[in-house]
Design a protein with these regions (language model features):
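Conserved active-site/ligand-binding neighborhood in enzyme cores
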Residues: 2-344
């Protein structure tokens, strides 16, 4: 893509992360035994917020309206020269690991192994028989996956500069420990805007997710062949695995026919759901506004989909290139929602 430098940003957590899902976490709000449970994997909105906050020279004024927030985020991406973000995924060394859903489980698989076994079982998969394919994936699933760590604590009160236990207000917090070398995203940066801005994040410390858990960043240039493109490669039609949720918004609609789930845009087939789950995903928490972002229906990360004939996956907005829409769909696509890794 002309005028764009491509980078791989590696996020290396130094402690377990708290990647909050929907719901409040406050012992006083729900009484005793309040609980916070981390999601298993980073959301694109968390990664985008992390990068934008590090690259900005000064804080921005909070906004109360959601669509005003969307417009402002697009302005910030343009100002910082961030054309697109694709991912995230896990990696051990240079080997990418991608999420896969089997029933209610989410685990991670070497992308090359996944593509190999998918092609071997393709004839059965196209007939709707996924049992052999999923059984094989469970046998080769890797230990490079998130693990939950539960901790128990009690609420505190501050009186005259001293902290005291608030009797009866217990809480549990389940953090996620990412068992891999790093979490990766691929970023297209406008070569003419803020030159070297992403490169200066190399070696920087970052606060990730809830409670500001610490991670270290590493930035590599992809153009020189240093890193392999996983989610930033463009293609048309074919099978792919979702690295991040594909948020479903009008004019997209779900159609169920003969046991198959497909997504249509108008009368055209957009994609078919081969395996995985349709559920709900929140778009994160805005620290500046101190409020949660909206929740939308989505095809969840780890699902395998088939882009219908003529449907494109592009670097700039991913699969949303096929969907006419406004600023929200543009933002979702640019920050990485609907990121795909092709399976051939």
């Amino acid at each position: 893509m002309s005028g764009v430098s491509v980078y791989q940003v590696r996020i290396k957590p130094l402690e377990p992360l708290m990647l909050r899902g929907p719901g409040e976490f406050d012992p006083s709000a729900r009484g005793v035994s309040a609980a916070a449970v981390s999601q298993a994997f980073l959301a694109p909105s968390t990664v985008a917020g992390l990068l934008v906050s590090l690259l900005l020279r000064r804080p921005v004024e909070p906004v109360s309206d959601w669509m005003c927030y969307v417009d402002r985020m697009l302005e910030l991406l343009n100002k910082l020269g961030i054309r697109w973000i694709r991912g995230p995924y896990l990696a051990q060394g240079s080997t990418p690991y991608v999420p896969i859903r089997a029933g209610g489980d989410l685990f991670f698989i070497d992308l090359h192994q996944l593509a190999y076994h998918f092609k071997r079982e393709l004839a059965n998969i196209e007939k709707g028989d996924l049992e052999g394919f999923m059984s094989r994936l469970r046998q080769i699933q890797d230990r490079a996956e998130p693990r939950l760590q539960e901790r128990v604590g009690i609420a505190l009160t501050a009186r005259e500069g001293l902290k005291a236990v608030r009797e009866g207000f217990l809480y549990t917090a389940s953090y996620v420990s990412v068992r891999c070398d790093y979490i990766a995203v691929e970023i297209g940066s406008d070569s003419g805007a803020a030159p070297g801005s992403l490169a200066r994040l190399n070696g920087a410390a970052a606060a990730v997710g809830g409670e500001g858990r610490v991670a270290r960043l590493e930035v590599l240039g992809v153009d020189g062949g240093v890193a392999e493109l996983v989610a930033g490669s463009e293609f048309e039609g074919g099978y792919a695995v979702l690295l991040s949720p594909l948020v479903l918004r009008s004019p997209m609609r779900i159609e169920r026919k003969g046991g198959r789930v497909s997504v249509k845009v108008g009368d055209k087939c957009f994609l078919e759901l081969i395996s995985g789950t349709v559920g709900l995903r929140g778009l994160g928490f805005s620290i500046a506004e101190r409020s949660r972002k909206p929740v939308y229906p989505a095809i969840l990360e780890g699902s395998i989909v088939k882009l219908c004939e003529g449907q494109r996956y592009t670097r700039d907005v991913g699969p949303y290139a096929n969907v006419p829409g406004g600023a929200l769909l543009e933002l979702l696509g640019r920050i990485g929602y609907g990121s795909l890794a092709a399976l051939g």
